[in-house]
């Protein structure tokens, strides 16, 4: 396998698109195979901690992700049976200062669209939909 052969990535979700972009940034072409007729995502709210936001920063996407994200002032975990508060973690400025990156809440489809747009702009990433028989 030469460095010009694309790395095959099965699945065009958040992980597949992120992997393709990371490979492309390191000079490796990537081919993302998605079984659906078109690239897209199912939607629900998700949370990303500083460790994940660091990846967006490395991909050059932190500004786009911040534009679509909410920055909660804290996270509270509660006992599902009793309703008792178990822990409260402030996620404001001191949190960001400590961990370098924010804790965000965002809609999964919005993050997927940011990654998908970045892949489409990157000449080293090939996106193949309806790829069930192509492998």
Name each region found by the language model.
Residues 37-57:
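Conserved N-terminal glycine-rich FAD pyrophosphate-binding loop of Rossmann-like flavoproteins
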């Amino acid at each position: 396998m030469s460095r010009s052969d694309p790395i095959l990535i099965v699945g065009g979700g958040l992980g597949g698109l992120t992997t393709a972009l990371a490979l492309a940034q390191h000079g490796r072409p990537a081919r993302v195979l998605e079984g659906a007729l078109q690239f897209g995502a199912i939607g629900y709210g998700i949370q990303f901690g500083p460790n994940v936001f660091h990846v967006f920063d490395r991909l050059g996407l932190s500004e786009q992700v911040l534009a679509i994200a909410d920055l909660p002032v804290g996270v509270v975990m509660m006992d599902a049976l009793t309703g008792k508060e178990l822990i409260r973690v402030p996620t404001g400025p001191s949190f960001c200062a400590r961990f370098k990156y924010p804790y965000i809440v965002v809609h999964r489809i919005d993050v997927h669209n940011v990654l998908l747009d970045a892949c489409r702009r990157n000449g080293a990433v090939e996106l193949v939909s309806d790829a069930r028989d192509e492998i």
